[in-house]
Amino acid sequence: MKNKLQLIIQIVFLALFLVLIITGRVQLWMGLFLLGIALALLFSRIYCGWICPINTVMNGVSWVKKKLGIKRQKTPPALARPWIRYLVLALFIATFITSMITGQEIPVLPALFAIGVILTFFFPEELWHRYLCPYGTILSLPASTAKYTMKIGQEKCNSCGICKKVCPAAAVEVNEKQYTINKKDCLVCLDCADHCKQEAISYC
């Protein structure tokens, strides 16, 4: 299910992001993010899985770690708390408002880009996607009501758990041996569908 088209789209948006940073116009990226919020209302968090430059580079880092056999640390329990994501979001909003009031440009997006990539070297991707990324927290709100999302067909699912294992955002949940995908946390990255041997997972 995951294909070359997705990779091409990710690389194109990553290149655009880098160009905006180099030319000092990274603030224009917010236009794409606002589009991502609008799209999330219907199509879930496709911004995260297909457009976000942070996620694209994190995928590359994870691939390198896997090839080199580098073991990742577990997500620190102190950070794996539901309220952490909202605390980070509050700090993000406060920084944004401060920037507007003072007129001083604060490189929030480049800083988040660096933090997300660095954390991936040491911890699972879910730490960033689920708890620390303020953009992801914002997108999780409209995504919770999205019509189209990744779904597990229960008639095909054999509860092998591979989808839960490969999900970078820990969006796959288990309730009485039944696997489901929490659409507010799902990145629509297609990793689960790509690894499902039963072909039980689809975007619909």
Residue ranges and their predicted role:
Residues 171:
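Conserved N-terminal phosphate-binding loop of PLP-dependent enzymes in the Aspartate aminotransferase
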